[in-house]
Every structure is written in structure tokens, then in C-alpha cells.
Amino acid sequence: MPYQQITVNVNDAVAERLADALMEHGALSAAIEDAYAGTQNEQAIFGEPGMPAEQIWQQSKVIALFGEHDEAAAIIQTAAQECGLKDLAYTGEILEDQDWVRLTQAQFDPIRISERLWITPSWHEAPEDTAVNLRLDPGLAFGTGSHPTTRLCLKWLDTQLKNGESVLDYGCGSGILTIAALKLGAGFAVGVDIDEQAVRAGKDNAEQNNVDAQFFLPDGLPQGQFDVVVANILANPLRMLGEMLAARTKQGGRIVLSGLLDEQAEELGGIYSQWFDLDPAETEEGWARLSGTKR
């Protein structure tokens, strides 16, 4: 059966109340996203390191799903009135019912990162048996290799990582960079994330790839420094975590930063140049990667 999907742009004062009201009046689901995601104005998502425990985007979009025959317009009007909103504008579209598992799988083919590095979902055969194949399925934790920032970090690991080096992947998400580091020759690799679900996903993905990776919440990360520190997170946490990431990098060790937009690279470079001699930024599809060596 088809579904109705409704999108409403609102501010942070009413986003959660509106989503709750829509659910109370019959929406099948209601999600809140950053209205500026993917732009220079995007904000750190819930739970980014250093941010308040309770946080929502200043400009959000509420995305609600309704059944085919639900009176979506009436429900939206009722929910808007309860939230003190008048003349609430929204957009709508029809989503056809499909085999969502099969459709999702069809959208994720193997991804070639370099001459020797592939990311391959479990339902696909490895394109090249002799290549380095990362077995990774799309899931709830960020990081499947399809995003430019992930590819930028993977390319750095593929070309710059030395055999036997230790690697810290801060903000590891699915664990893709931690796992890739081990498959590319790292002697020891640790993934850290503030999300317990990401830590679990990292452990599961490491097991699927037959590598001995360790994953921790930030408070559980053992003391020590690393040859390579990778942080593929957003610009705001990168601003706040600079001193800590530098302290975790050995003298002469290297840092790799991504998750920032091209136009944010100069500012972030100015911050990290306090501790690192930085290489020229690399960019892909409007996203940037910074790397450098600790003095």
C-alpha cells in the first residue's frame, strides 16, 4: 500500500512538540532532521562530543509518514493548532509500497575506493578476490563508504598508512575506518564513539571482517598515544576536540580530519596548525580532508 510522506520546516522551539502531536493523532512515524544538513549551516547532530545532552537544530524539518487513506492534512492542522502554529506550510509526496529490504540492497553495490580497496555488502560477491575487501552492510551507524568524507579517509589510509602503525578512529560510527586500517596493515586499531549503538556495530562489523579491532565509548578509551589519529566527524566537534586529538597523537605521528565542508577547511586548518604541520587540503564533492604531522 502507498504511504503519504509529509515534510514541515519549523524552528527548535516546536519541532519535538509537533512530531509528538503528529504521532498522537495518527502518524505512523515522525522524524526530526537538520533543515540545513549538507550545507555550510548544518549543525552537529544529537550527542556530538562537547554539545549539551539535550539538543535540537535551530531550523529543523519534521518528516511524518501516514497511511494511504489517512487524513494527513487534517492531522497536520490539528497538530499545528496544538503547538500554536498558524498557516503551517508543508510539502507532501506519495511513497509506493515496495520490498524495502530488496530495494535497500539494490541501492548498495560494491564501492571501489582505490586499485586494491573495495567495500562490499554481504549479499554481494567480492568483485576482486585478491583485493582488500571490506565487508560492510548499511545500518544504523554512520559510515558505509558511500559518503565523500569516508572515501577521503579511506584513500589516505590506503596510500599513507605504514605497516604496524597504531590507529585511533575517533567518531568511528560503523567502524569502517578502524577495520580498514587493520586490513591495510595497522598493527593495532581502536574505534571510539559516543553512541553505544555505534560501538556495538563496530564490534559486529569487525567480527564479520575477521579483524581484532577494539571499540570503546570515550570514557572507556585507555590512556596512550597513537601513530595515526583519524576523526571523520563534523566541523563543530573538530573545533572543540583539537587539543584532545593532538594529545592522543604521538610526536611525529599523523592526523587525518574529515567531515568538514570545503569552505570550513581553512578555519579548521588554522586551529590544528597549533600542533601539526598540515598538508594541502584534499576535496571531493564539496567536502574536505585535512592531514598533517605532529611537531
Curated annotation (Swiss-Prot):
Keywords: Cytoplasm, Methyltransferase, S-adenosyl-L-methionine, Transferase. One of its GO terms (cellular component) is cytosol. This is Ribosomal protein L11 methyltransferase. It is found in: Cytoplasm. S-adenosyl-L-methionine binds at T150, G171, D193, N232. GO terms for biological process: methylation. Signal peptide: none annotated. It catalyses: L-lysyl-[protein] + 3 S-adenosyl-L-methionine = N(6),N(6),N(6)-trimethyl-L-lysyl-[protein] + 3 S-adenosyl-L-homocysteine + 3 H(+). Its EC number is 2.1.1.-. Methylates ribosomal protein L11. It comes from Neisseria meningitidis serogroup A / serotype 4A (strain DSM 15465 / Z2491). InterPro entries: Ribosomal_L11_MeTrfase_PrmA, Ribosomal_PrmA_MeTrfase, SAM-dependent_MTases_sf. It comes from the Bacteria. One of its GO terms (molecular function) is protein-lysine N-methyltransferase activity. Its main location: cytoplasm. Gene3D superfamilies: Vaccinia Virus protein VP39 (3.40.50.150). The keyword Transcription regulation does not apply. Pfam families: PrmA. SUPFAM superfamilies: S-adenosyl-L-methionine-dependent methyltransferases. It is an enzyme of class 2 (transferase). Belongs to the methyltransferase superfamily. PrmA family.
